[in-house]
């Protein structure tokens, strides 16, 4: 980049337009630490709309909206059992295992200063959580009054979001704090430790969620390019 060519990126202008967290996210994902990288508003907007709005934002919004709709905003108890034998729920167990297993690849990536790879491990979990919603179709569970399975599905999603927020905090602190508050977790996310908060079960059933506005409203390309 060169001032004489007029292609210098003003970070303050980018932050004013897109926000600090999306800009940080883009740089971590697109630019290897310590190396040169390319920046374009088009690429940032694509990351914003695809990764942040569609993947993460929709996962939080859909999960909390269903908890509001089906459980009056109260995090359901996944241990509720039907009178008959519990039906296995492989998808929930798989997502739980993946959320619990983020730490190994995440820690190794940080040791190597591979911040993009660290975020990749978190995004793999986000993508699988979205797939879990489509596979289990909670709306159909509600229609058939399968509240036991619905409880387990929605608790699994909400607890996965809690763990995701913990891992995102070093990279996107404002976003992680918003997720934390919408899950209505009492303690400050800035004071948590990965070793403790990455363990499954930190979100207590019976917690009243506080769903807020969309984390990342989609950007209309023609208004920003």
Please give the residue ranges for each predicted region:
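Short hydrophobic "helix-edge" motifs at membrane interfaces and signal-peptide entry regions
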Residues: 8-10, 102-104, 162-164
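Catalytic adenosine-cofactor/nucleotide-binding cores of aminoacyl-tRNA synthetases and other
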Residues: 1-84, 186-207, 211-223
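Basic, alpha-helical terminal appendages of large translation-related enzymes
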Residues: 37, 108, 112-114, 123-225
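Short, hydrophobic, well-ordered secondary-structure elements
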Residues: 53, 57-67, 119, 123-126, ...
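Conserved, charged catalytic cores of large soluble enzymes
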Residues: 60-106, 126, 130-146
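Secondary-structure capping and boundary motifs in well-ordered enzyme cores
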Residues: 3, 14-15, 44-55, 87-99, ...
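Short, charged/polar, low-complexity loop and linker segments
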Residues: 36-41, 100-108
């Amino acid at each position: 980049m060169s001032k004489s060519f007029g292609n210098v990126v003003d970070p303050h202008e980018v932050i004013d337009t897109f926000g600090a967290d999306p800009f940080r996210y883009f740089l971590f994902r697109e630019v290897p630490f310590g190396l040169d990288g390319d920046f374009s508003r088009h690429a940032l907007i694509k990351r914003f709309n695809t990764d942040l709005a569609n993947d993460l934002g929709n996962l939080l919004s859909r999960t909390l909206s269903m908890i509001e709709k089906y459980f009056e905003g109260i995090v359901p108890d996944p241990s509720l059992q039907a009178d008959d034998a519990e039906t296995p729920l492989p998808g929930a167990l798989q997502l739980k295992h993946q959320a619990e297993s983020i730490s190994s690849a995440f820690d190794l990536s940080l040791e190597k200063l591979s911040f993009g790879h660290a975020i990749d491990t978190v995004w793999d979990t986000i993508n699988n959580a979205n797939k879990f919603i489509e596979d289990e179709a909670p709306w159909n569970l509600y229609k058939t009054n399968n509240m036991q399975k619905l409880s387990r599905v929605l608790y699994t999603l909400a607890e996965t979001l809690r763990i995701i927020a913990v891992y995102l905090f070093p990279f996107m602190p404002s976003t992680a704090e918003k997720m934390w508050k919408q899950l209505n977790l009492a303690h400050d996310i800035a004071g948590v430790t990965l070793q403790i908060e990455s363990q499954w079960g930190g979100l207590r059933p019976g917690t009243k969620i506080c769903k807020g506005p969309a984390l990342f409203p989609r950007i209309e390309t023609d208004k920003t390019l």
